């Protein structure tokens, strides 16, 4: 897919942005959509450009991109603008990854998937206008937590939300393939947004062989060079849940070969502080045989997840009451 073709395909997608958008944001997004549509109606397709946005504070950076707070000049709608230099993408041989990310993420609309609102490019840069997740990478919060781990109620809630997002992806024939805390963002309401679809794949036939993702999260079938299906995401969810409650991935080692060996031998140890339900869920996801892994629906309905979500809600309510009492005093 060329940049131009992807851009026009994405523009046809914009009127559907209002679906599941919070009411207070519907009018600004509608204005953005109408602005594009009105130009198209007169036979002059409107191309977004940096001139349409006021660029603000620097929010962060990745290997190939920098993210800024930006405001659309007409509607004043705030976005997180990811800016990537084409030359850096070319040198890193990741042009196809970026196009795949744009093509797939622009079509996914789910409350726990970071929304790609639109995109455009100029001679030297590519711009992705993304939904804002104000609390940033989940990895930062995990590293900042006591003992670098979350408690079980918080972990259960986050596991549910990621499972929900992945289930939606699979229903749309998309495998994420690079699940990890760095690729998940957190909102001010303690909700997760799955992001970074650079390694994702649209798989109607549901079979792949590409080795990709993050070393500590690789499933046995990838390590052994075998074909795989969307159940690799279940494996990665098991690793993620383990990292939530323990503070590190289960197969982490000081070398690639050692990590591969641990994955092949399924060397998993569970600390004594983990509950029976937590270990049961992780064990159901981390099965060497992909067909034996529990489904994402099984995850969402698991008793440990449901109980943890309820307890997390009570934690958040208590925290809000504490803030209100502090404000009064």
Swiss-Prot record:
What keywords does the record list, in alphabetical order?
ATP-binding, Cell cycle, Cell division, Chromatin regulator, Chromosome, Chromosome partition, Cytoplasm, Cytoskeleton, Kinase, Magnesium, Meiosis, Metal-binding, Mitosis, Nucleotide-binding, Serine/threonine-protein kinase, Transferase
GO cellular component labels? centrosome; chromosome passenger complex; chromosome, centromeric region; condensed chromosome, centromeric region; cytoplasm; kinetochore; meiotic spindle midzone; midbody
According to UniProt, the reaction catalysed is:
L-seryl-[protein] + ATP = O-phospho-L-seryl-[protein] + ADP + H(+); L-threonyl-[protein] + ATP = O-phospho-L-threonyl-[protein] + ADP + H(+)
Is this entry keyworded Cell cycle?
yes
Signal peptide annotation? none
Residues annotated as domain Protein kinase: 53-305
Subcellular localization, as worded in the UniProt entry: Chromosome; Cytoplasm, Cytoskeleton; Midbody
Top EC class for this record = transferase
Record-given protein name: Aurora kinase B
Provide the gene name from the record: aurB
